[in-house]
Amino acid sequence: VTGVQTCSLPILTPVFHYGYEPFFTKCEEVGINGIIIPDMPYEEKGELNDIARSHQVDVISLIAPTSEQRIQKIAADAEGFIYLVSSLGVTGVRSEIKTDLDSMIAAIRKVTDIPVAVGFGINTTDQAANIAKIADGVIVGSAIVKMIAKYGTHAEQHIYTYVRMMKEAVMTANK
């Protein structure tokens, strides 16, 4: 719908209680054009997706390691971009990514050319560079949250330096 620029990542319960229509009206008003709801099963996104579309908001699909058939089913219906989950389990920093991302991206590419961004545990420049070689984007979240927890009100410079290093790793990998 929009070529996602600004995303929000809420859990489903507050969105449901607030109401889909008022929630997506507010998203449109403030310029959020993509939403990732990590606890919403793919099979349950129908009604929410219709309302989101009416407000120019893409519901971003998450694809976790699963069968090729399910990967392709979710990918064929995706909009904005695909959030490819790098590992099973809870989010957070991981020392290594063991999932066969190449095969998952190949399965996605059989049904769509929508951008694929990989996240879930990405925290080192080496991980970011390696993922940037095969995916369209790299998502880093928990590592930044940990910096905020560690440095509090003094986190800004640490985050800036970290994000700059991650960006350089991604840009270098894409040359």
Provide a role label for each language-model segment.
Residues 1-9:
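Short, small-residue-biased leader/transition segments that mark boundaries at the very start
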Residues 8-37, 168-173:
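Active-site beta->alpha loop and helix N-cap motifs at the rims of alpha/beta catalytic domains
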Residues 15-22, 37-54, 67-73, 92-106, ...:
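Active-site-adjacent beta->alpha loops and helix N-cap segments on the catalytic face
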Residues 27, 74, 108, 131, ...:
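Conserved, mostly hydrophobic/aromatic
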Residues 27-33, 53-59, 77-84, 134-137:
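Glycine-enriched alpha-helix->loop->beta-strand junction motifs that scaffold or abut catalytic
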Residues 28, 49-53, 102-112, 163-174:
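Surface-exposed amphipathic alpha-helices with a cationic face
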Residues 32-36, 41-44, 84-92, 121, ...:
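Glycine-rich phosphate-binding active-site loops on the catalytic face of alpha/beta enzymes
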Residues 66-76, 118, 122-138:
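Catalytic cores of alpha/beta
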